[in-house]
């Protein structure tokens, strides 16, 4: 019986295999491939060349990696004054907010700085408050962390850390019945200033409408104790309006203070919308004028915030009123919203406009004007200039035109600090 081959293997027999001749017809080319022969360009070993694109050209013309990691990289004029906005919030409820301009950004305070740590330690040990912390001043890292301890500055706030008024721009705590005055505060303040060894100090106060004298005698006692511990110490006081009681303003003026400062904060038109209802533009002018009348040699000073919606005519009017009341020094700074509970910023004023108003104030006859986005009531260039003027007066030098002539030199000193 013949052996039968399995059916499944029949397909593998040689009789069933057919040789298919290789086609000599050329393969069909793809539509994107050119039929013309391409000449190959020799490439550099280890490097592939890519054709340039508009995207790569844009990247090459833009900022480099160093521009992103270097915070001090210079900006173009267009970028420097550009106001940027951003959309925040959940979908359907997004709102547009304005980002902080480049010229208003400041370094974060660091405890690594020895001067910063020492000043903070002294203040805590003596139970003293500063307006630097309470008002969230943007210059605290510069003032508390000066190049040397003598160059560091802290503005001490007297009569506690709670104010009886509620201005719409201010971050200081408010209460109708703040804690009573600390009877040891004058001595503690004088001792802290003696430890620091500063030549020029700034003291500010909260408004205390709950006190019969608005705290005038407490302030005067503090200044006198400071002078007792260091007779050459120059003291600037940034005080309130004492509820319109001009006699209390004169009590402070007679205490031995060297610079009598009281801020009008804004223009007369905007005062009812910016300051507490008990603070009035004319009342502030009366306080400054009465201090000058009590002591004609006293330097009087005030400060204004820009960016609240004021017009040029509003500012001209305010400056004319200040000169009519013999105010010597004026400063301009940008209003910066402390929290969302406070009034919003109307606009961010450019550094060029601040410089313009500085020149205008000097042309009107002010002894000194500090003007800039980050300038506050206590400003180092202003302190350096006023300190120089006061020392010359003590030596019997004239302080009129010579003081103004030394303005630029004093500003350089302030920048160096």
From Swiss-Prot:
- Describe the location of the Radical SAM core domain by residue ranges: 146-367
Instruction: Give the EC number(s) under which this enzyme is classified.
Output: 2.8.1.8
Q: Name one GO molecular function term.
A: metal ion binding
Essential cofactor(s): [4Fe-4S] cluster
Disulphide-bridged cysteine pairs: none
Sites where the protein binds [4Fe-4S] cluster 1? 132, 137, 143, 378
Identify the stretch(es) annotated as Disordered: 23-62
Where, per UniProt, does this protein localize?
A: Mitochondrion
Q: Which NCBIfam families match?
A: lipA, PRK05481.1, PRK12928.1
Q: Which InterPro entries match?
A: Aldolase_TIM, Elp3/MiaA/NifB-like_rSAM, LIAS_N, Lipoyl_synth, rSAM
Could you tell me which SUPFAM superfamilies the record lists for this protein?
Radical SAM enzymes
The principal localisation class reads mitochondrion
Protein name per Swiss-Prot or TrEMBL:
Lipoyl synthase, mitochondrial
- What is the source species? Pyrenophora tritici-repentis (strain Pt-1C-BFP)
Entry binding sites for [4Fe-4S] cluster 2: 163, 167, 170
Q: Where does the transit peptide lie?
A: 1-30
Q: Kindly indicate whether the keyword Zinc-finger belongs to this entry.
A: no
Q: Does the keyword Iron-sulfur apply?
A: yes
Question: Residues of the signal sequence?
Answer: none
The biological pathway it contributes to is:
Protein modification; protein lipoylation via endogenous pathway; protein N(6)-(lipoyl)lysine from octanoyl-[acyl-carrier-protein]: step 2/2
One Pfam family named in its UniProt record: Radical_SAM
SMART domains, sorted: Elp3 (SM00729)
> What's the family?
Belongs to the radical SAM superfamily. Lipoyl synthase family.
Q: What is the lineage of its organism?
A: Eukaryota, Fungi, Dikarya, Ascomycota, Pezizomycotina
- Polar residues bias (residue ranges): 30-41, 51-61
